[in-house]
């Protein structure tokens, strides 16, 4: 590997695209402490805050997705795209990267397109079981694709698609050793079951309403909650914070949140699914319906088809949530079976395997 490695990572919009990119950057830095790493994301999105918190520089592009319903915002999309392509060209010219890595999200498309046009090695990290339109287009000319699901080879060029799994935070590999610390951190009772509720980094309105409506039921069942409400809804629901309901806008110590949990209620974003497989706890997935091509439901089904989790769609929640979820809480054998089966789906070395592919690409270039 050459001295002075220079890497651009691009991805964002949601935590599911940001945290894999940060995990890859951390592994590159671990192997090559002198590496220069630059992030590129969508301006005004959460990556502009989360990436600097992780210790990396980031530049923003004026870019967003296309609204799938009719919207006036779509009329300015071509101007955003042209602006982002122009800025991406300038960023690449100035930074001179050895490789460009895209983890999905609005910002990665323009940057990868310019990198490909200039013959710079490119790696796409596809988290979902159903790839988005941008990655489908870019995959034809990208150097390599690292994916989490075997079925994406039906969409991507199979000869350059490698199944590595999704990058996960390395601190999640030891959550089974952190139970006592986790209960103390969240000030929870060791004598009650703990349910962790995750609605994604921004929050999930339907999940928050569900939990609000069932707070008495949780209390009656002797269950305590760690409830990640999300940035968009925290002011509305923070009033429920109590000794048995730990209401949080955002959870910085996810390793401890997972360690405290007996059962987890979660969206089914690709990054979350990968983390939950590594953690190995029983899960109820409530996929977001507000995503392209219903990919969260497909991510969840890739787990449930192995008898490794439950899934309830938002349309089914009113009828099915209480009987399904609370019967699971009382069924230790089923909880243990789900935990064992979901753990079998984990690919805990994904981050390392992806950086191995980065090294191969750069070594082939030199």
Swiss-Prot record:
<dbReference type="GO" id="GO:0009252">
    <property type="term" value="P:peptidoglycan biosynthetic process"/>
</dbReference>
<comment type="pathway">
    <text>Cell wall biogenesis; peptidoglycan biosynthesis.</text>
</comment>
<keyword id="KW-0132">Cell division</keyword>
<keyword id="KW-0961">Cell wall biogenesis/degradation</keyword>
<keyword id="KW-0328">Glycosyltransferase</keyword>
<dbReference type="InterPro" id="IPR004276">
    <property type="entry name" value="GlycoTrans_28_N"/>
</dbReference>
<dbReference type="GO" id="GO:0050511">
    <property type="term" value="F:undecaprenyldiphospho-muramoylpentapeptide beta-N-acetylglucosaminyltransferase activity"/>
</dbReference>
<dbReference type="InterPro" id="IPR006009">
    <property type="entry name" value="GlcNAc_MurG"/>
</dbReference>
<dbReference type="GO" id="GO:0051301">
    <property type="term" value="P:cell division"/>
</dbReference>
<dbReference type="GO" id="GO:0005975">
    <property type="term" value="P:carbohydrate metabolic process"/>
</dbReference>
<keyword id="KW-0808">Transferase</keyword>
<comment type="function">
    <text>Cell wall formation. Catalyzes the transfer of a GlcNAc subunit on undecaprenyl-pyrophosphoryl-MurNAc-pentapeptide (lipid intermediate I) to form undecaprenyl-pyrophosphoryl-MurNAc-(pentapeptide)GlcNAc (lipid intermediate II).</text>
</comment>
<dbReference type="GO" id="GO:0051991">
    <property type="term" value="F:UDP-N-acetyl-D-glucosamine:N-acetylmuramoyl-L-alanyl-D-glutamyl-meso-2,6-diaminopimelyl-D-alanyl-D-alanine-diphosphoundecaprenol 4-beta-N-acetylglucosaminlytransferase activity"/>
</dbReference>
<feature type="binding site">
    <location>
        <position position="169"/>
    </location>
    <ligand>
        <name>UDP-N-acetyl-alpha-D-glucosamine</name>
    </ligand>
</feature>
<dbReference type="Pfam" id="PF03033">
    <property type="entry name" value="Glyco_transf_28"/>
</dbReference>
<feature type="binding site">
    <location>
        <position position="128"/>
    </location>
    <ligand>
        <name>UDP-N-acetyl-alpha-D-glucosamine</name>
    </ligand>
</feature>
<feature type="binding site">
    <location>
        <begin position="14"/>
        <end position="16"/>
    </location>
    <ligand>
        <name>UDP-N-acetyl-alpha-D-glucosamine</name>
    </ligand>
</feature>
<keyword id="KW-0997">Cell inner membrane</keyword>
<dbReference type="Pfam" id="PF04101">
    <property type="entry name" value="Glyco_tran_28_C"/>
</dbReference>
<keyword id="KW-0472">Membrane</keyword>
<dbReference type="GO" id="GO:0071555">
    <property type="term" value="P:cell wall organization"/>
</dbReference>
<keyword id="KW-0133">Cell shape</keyword>
<protein>
    <recommendedName>
        <fullName>UDP-N-acetylglucosamine--N-acetylmuramyl-(pentapeptide) pyrophosphoryl-undecaprenol N-acetylglucosamine transferase</fullName>
        <ecNumber>2.4.1.227</ecNumber>
    </recommendedName>
</protein>
<feature type="binding site">
    <location>
        <position position="296"/>
    </location>
    <ligand>
        <name>UDP-N-acetyl-alpha-D-glucosamine</name>
    </ligand>
</feature>
<dbReference type="InterPro" id="IPR007235">
    <property type="entry name" value="Glyco_trans_28_C"/>
</dbReference>
<dbReference type="GO" id="GO:0030259">
    <property type="term" value="P:lipid glycosylation"/>
</dbReference>
<dbReference type="GO" id="GO:0005886">
    <property type="term" value="C:plasma membrane"/>
</dbReference>
<keyword id="KW-0131">Cell cycle</keyword>
<dbReference type="GO" id="GO:0008360">
    <property type="term" value="P:regulation of cell shape"/>
</dbReference>
<comment type="similarity">
    <text>Belongs to the glycosyltransferase 28 family. MurG subfamily.</text>
</comment>
<keyword id="KW-1003">Cell membrane</keyword>
<feature type="binding site">
    <location>
        <position position="201"/>
    </location>
    <ligand>
        <name>UDP-N-acetyl-alpha-D-glucosamine</name>
    </ligand>
</feature>
<feature type="binding site">
    <location>
        <position position="251"/>
    </location>
    <ligand>
        <name>UDP-N-acetyl-alpha-D-glucosamine</name>
    </ligand>
</feature>
<keyword id="KW-0573">Peptidoglycan synthesis</keyword>
